[in-house]
Design a protein with these regions (language model features):
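Short, well-ordered coil/turn segments that N-cap beta-strands
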Residues: 46-51, 72-74, 112-115, 134-135
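Hydrophobic faces of well-ordered beta-strands that scaffold small-molecule active sites
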Residues: 51-56, 76-78, 116-118, 137-139
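Glycine-enriched alpha-helix->loop->beta-strand junction motifs that scaffold or abut catalytic
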Residues: 17-19, 70-75, 131-137
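Glycine-rich phosphate-binding active-site loops on the catalytic face of alpha/beta enzymes
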Residues: 7, 76-85, 135-152
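Conserved, mostly hydrophobic/aromatic
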Residues: 67, 79, 129
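Single conserved hydrophobic/aromatic residue that forms the stacking wall/gate
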Residues: 1-16
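Glycine-rich tight-turn/loop motif centered on a GG-T
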Residues: 17-27, 86-100, 140
């Protein structure tokens, strides 16, 4: 039924339950705590949904104005690694081409009052993107942080 929604409003059709959207209502999924929640409360749960659109390629940049006009999106999250690959320089997330593309997204999104997020590998990158205006910063991953802590601990024993 998603094809019935206006192209720009598809995310909201997915997010919201009746009467505003067409979100599935199966109570036996994770969102419903595998049926461990009150069946009527579940239908109200679309009020508690956080919509994060991931911008990870050239198409996202090309369609950014349209994306920025979608109502109800809470966060635009830039995926720097996938974006770098889409730009033809895989893994080079600090390459000026990638950085400038990301800065453009941040500027345009902030001009529309949108919250922007991204992933960073280093404390230096975190500081840089924070200064640029990114409000939601995801640093490393749990396993990476754990490995770094183990390496530091091991060094302290030497």
């Amino acid at each position: 039924d998603l094809h019935l929604c206006d192209r720009r409003q598809r995310q909201m059709c997915i997010r919201d339950s009746y009467p505003y959207g067409m979100r599935g209502v199966c109570r036996f999924v994770r969102a419903a705590d595998y049926s461990n929640c009150d069946r009527y409360k579940f239908f109200e749960s679309s009020k508690d949904v956080l919509i994060i659109l991931q911008l990870e390629g050239i198409k996202a940049i090309e369609n950014l104005d349209e994306i920025l006009d979608v109502e109800g999106v809470d966060i635009l999250f830039i995926g720097p690694y996938d974006l770098s690959q889409s730009l033809g320089i895989p893994g080079q997330v600090n390459n000026p081409v990638v950085v400038n593309a990301m800065k453009d997204i941040v500027e345009r999104a902030k001009a529309k009052g949108k919250v922007v997020g991204t992933f960073v590998d280093t404390p230096q990158d975190l500081k840089m993107w924070k200064e640029i205006g990114v409000q939601y910063l995801s640093y490393s991953v749990d396993v990476g942080i754990f490995i770094d802590a183990c390496k530091q601990l091991r060094k302290s024993f030497e």
